[in-house]
């Protein structure tokens, strides 16, 4: 199904093409200025109701340890609680299923809250936490090994207490345990199901898994024995997988879904004009970027990678691809972030002449071709076309292979190594050490070429997690970011804003800096 269809029918009432075009035309003169972060009204939440959501991508996996797509999180959070959580305003770690303490810099003690059970009825106790942390560190299929690389051993010291012995101090570990590494799966289910747990997940979150039809629908329902009473109000959530974002918004306008998230700014006027919809916006760490496989021919030359960065017109990209509503990305942290390094902001001005000179020095003055992974939705295709035009002006021809997010991402980061470049995004993490560790650690999943750039970079990755003092850490990140950008290990493009269209009958939504919806506090009137 695509935008050319005369009607949209996702098991509900159709919205005629004429009605849709009237909405578009009526919104044509609407202001496109993005507002400040906003949240939906917080009335007294009512229990009940099934929330229907337009999901942006098919999950790569429903096992937190084996998945690899940033778009998975919004599904995973329904079925899994995390040992540590983050506050919505600043992503600061706060206790979740467990609290933590550091008796000394190389020891973390986790104290698990009582009464937590998995969806199969088994207890989420110290043994379960040890199983999960060891699984994440050692399982062959785990994609979170880099997150847990500081852990030397995990020991059960009480029914609800675990001692984590560290190989080196790690101040980022609480934030790490608020992400995939802190999502606890049932040991009983994981052992019994093996690889099938990817599709039949058993967690301890507010909702339990019901069904998943690839590229169609994911359904979860309330877990009646959920350990908290102040959240998880919905009876269930149904995700319709609609990768074309404009089509997803149509489904909400037509009343077939209650919510569409991750929308492009170009659709804001339609949301503003539509009846009974709220627009929720907010800043994010979501960085559109070009991933580079450093092991590929030509891209193993720093001059070629630098040429790509000089060839990019980021200001134009934000204007055209994001309707002017975004922030130019000169590194992988936005200007408002505490670890942002302003000295690097002008490292790669738009300079096609410089790009061509670097390619000439690299022996590629007559031009060359690269294969690029790209997604099939309209906005991804448009972003690819913009980049294709910009790089083409300096003699770099891009040949695209397109597919779904899980398919293309897996082919780039997994064993196939199918493309030279990937136009995608880094969706952000609660702590910047996670971002840089997951992308540039020698064996990290998102280091597509599995290349060790330099011993200094690897040392800085460890140092970035060694201190709790933000000023000390900022100095480390300054050095780390300088290596990343001077070596042109990535080509950042822009930071996006969160744009969600939510029906007015839905209450309690809170934006977050990751720009990914969590549903724990949502209720329906």
Where are these regions (language model features)?
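N-terminal secretory signal peptides
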Residues: 1-19, 26-33
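N-terminal lobe/hinge region of extracytoplasmic solute-binding protein
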Residues: 54-105, 134, 200-202
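Gly/Pro-rich hinge or "lid" segments in bacterial periplasmic/extracellular proteins
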Residues: 87-89, 178-232, 236, 353, ...
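Surface-exposed binding/hinge segments that line
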Residues: 111, 146-189, 211
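Ligand-site clamp/hinge motif
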Residues: 224-270, 397
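Extracytoplasmic/peripheral linker and loop segments enriched in polar/acidic and small residues
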Residues: 303, 379, 397-410, 435-504, ...
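Structural transition elements
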Residues: 327-361, 379-382
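Long beta-strand-rich cores associated with HINT superfamily self-processing modules
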Residues: 500-525
């Amino acid at each position: 199904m695509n935008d050319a269809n005369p009607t949209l029918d996702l098991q509900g009432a159709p919205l005629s093409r004429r009605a849709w075009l009237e909405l578009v035309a009526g919104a044509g003169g609407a202001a496109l200025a993005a507002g400040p972060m906003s949240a939906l009204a917080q009335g007294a939440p009512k229990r009940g109701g099934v929330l229907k959501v337009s999901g942006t991508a098919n999950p790569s996996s429903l096992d937190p340890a084996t998945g690899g797509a940033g778009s998975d999180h919004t599904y995973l959070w329904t079925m899994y609680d995390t040992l540590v959580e983050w506050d919505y305003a600043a992503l600061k770690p706060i206790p979740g299923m467990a609290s933590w303490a550091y008796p000394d810099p190389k020891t973390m003690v986790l104290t698990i809250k009582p009464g937590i059970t998995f969806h199969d009825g088994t207890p989420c106790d110290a043994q379960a936490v040890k199983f999960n942390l060891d699984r994440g560190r050692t399982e062959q299929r785990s994609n979170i090994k880099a997150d847990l690389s500081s852990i030397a051993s995990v020991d059960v010291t009480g029914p609800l207490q675990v001692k984590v012995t560290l190989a080196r101090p790690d101040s980022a570990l609480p934030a790490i345990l608020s992400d995939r590494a802190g999502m606890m799966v049932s040991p009983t289910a994981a052992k019994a199901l093996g690889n099938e747990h990817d599709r039949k997940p058993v967690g301890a979150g507010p909702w339990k898994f019901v069904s998943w039809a690839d590229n169609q629908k994911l359904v979860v329902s309330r877990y009646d024995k959920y350990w908290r009473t102040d959240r998880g109000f919905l009876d269930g959530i149904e995700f319709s997988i609609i990768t074309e974002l404009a089509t997803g918004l149509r489904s909400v306008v037509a009343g077939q879904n209650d919510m569409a998230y991750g929308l492009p700014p170009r659709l804001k006027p339609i949301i503003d004009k539509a009846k009974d919809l709220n627009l929720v916006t907010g800043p994010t760490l979501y960085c559109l970027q070009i991933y580079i496989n450093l092991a590929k021919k030509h891209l193993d030359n720093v001059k070629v990678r630098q040429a790509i960065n000089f060839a990019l017109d980021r200001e134009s990209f934000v204007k055209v691809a994001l309707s002017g509503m975004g922030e130019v990305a000169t590194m992988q942290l936005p200007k408002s972030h505490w670890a942002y390094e302003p000295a690097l902001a002008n490292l790669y001005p738009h300079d096609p002449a410089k790009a061509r000179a670097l390619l000439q020095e690299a022996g590629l003055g007559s031009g060359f071709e690269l294969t690029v992974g790209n997604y099939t939705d309209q906005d991804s295709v448009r972003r690819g076309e913009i980049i294709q035009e910009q790089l083409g002006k300096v003699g770099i021809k891009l040949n695209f292979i397109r597919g779904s997010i899980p398919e293309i991402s897996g082919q780039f980061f997994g064993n196939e190594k199918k493309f030279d470049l990937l136009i995608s995004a880094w969706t952000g993490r609660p702590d910047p050490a996670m971002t840089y560790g997951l992308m540039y650690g020698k064996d990290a999943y998102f280091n597509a070429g599995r290349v060790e750039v330099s011993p200094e970079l690897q040392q800085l990755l460890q140092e970035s997690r060694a201190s709790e003092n933000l000023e000390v850490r900022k100095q480390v990140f300054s050095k780390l970011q300088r290596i990343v950008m001077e070596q042109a290990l990535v080509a950042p493009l822009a930071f996006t804003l969160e744009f969600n269209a939510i029906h007015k009958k839905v209450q309690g939504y809170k934006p977050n800096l990751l720009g990914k919806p969590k549903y724990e506090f949502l209720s329906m009137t």
